Amino acid sequence: MQIDFYHWGGMCPLADEFINLVHLSTPTLTVESHDLTTNFALAREKKVFFPFLTVVDHIHRYYAPITGSFMEKLKQGILPVERPYCPKLGQTVYIATIEPITRDNYALAKQCTGRKSCGGCNTKLRMYDAVGERILGFVHREGNRLLGGAEFYPSMFVPYDIPHKEDTAFITCVYGSDETFDYKSAPLEALEGYLSETYRYALVVADEESVFPNGDLPFFLRHGYRDKGILLTDDYCRLHLLAKNL
């Protein structure tokens, strides 16, 4: 089997972990990793709109984080079955403490990875340093507990096949809700307010039903984003590009 792992640098702080995992392979697997940070052409060719993508034998696309059990199945010649992550989302907006995400408090924001230690977090911070951004987004916390967050990157440096303009920001990640409460509306609105000081527009890629990479689609429509059309359709997702005037 041929395994190709595509990733946008360290935009997902777990990318380094996944790269190490895919390269711990047996002779039955041929593994290559591809950093898309400056390779916009490859991202467009492979239709990558997630911070990482695993492709098996040049055909089978997998979007979820790589796990040991996933790799074990591939080593046995078994194609894993992947299902979209579509949790029930509460729509009651909850607001605790909202603050900018910076290098100083990123230890809180990285709780979204579900890891106690995150070796790739410094890689992500360096990506923002490289484009002169001190603020990554906004975090929603209650004490030292992460509730949600919203992050962005200048669209000019996003490798996905989207419009790249200096007056446009790209919403990279919006996270945090449960069945009862919506924890991500408040940080998203704070982020939009901050972005409006520099940018005229915000773009985001969202799935119709899943919350990965962002979503679901109705969430952004409720927040005033306009549906600009479908970017990708397959058995896992139906991704839309959305835009909003800031």
Regions found by a protein language model. Give the residues of each.
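Non-catalytic, surface beta->alpha helical segment in thiol-disulfide oxidoreductase systems
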Residues: 57-85
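A conserved beta-strand-loop-helix scaffold within acyl/acetyltransferase catalytic domains
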Residues: 120-168
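Conserved GNAT acetyl-CoA-binding A-motif
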Residues: 195-211
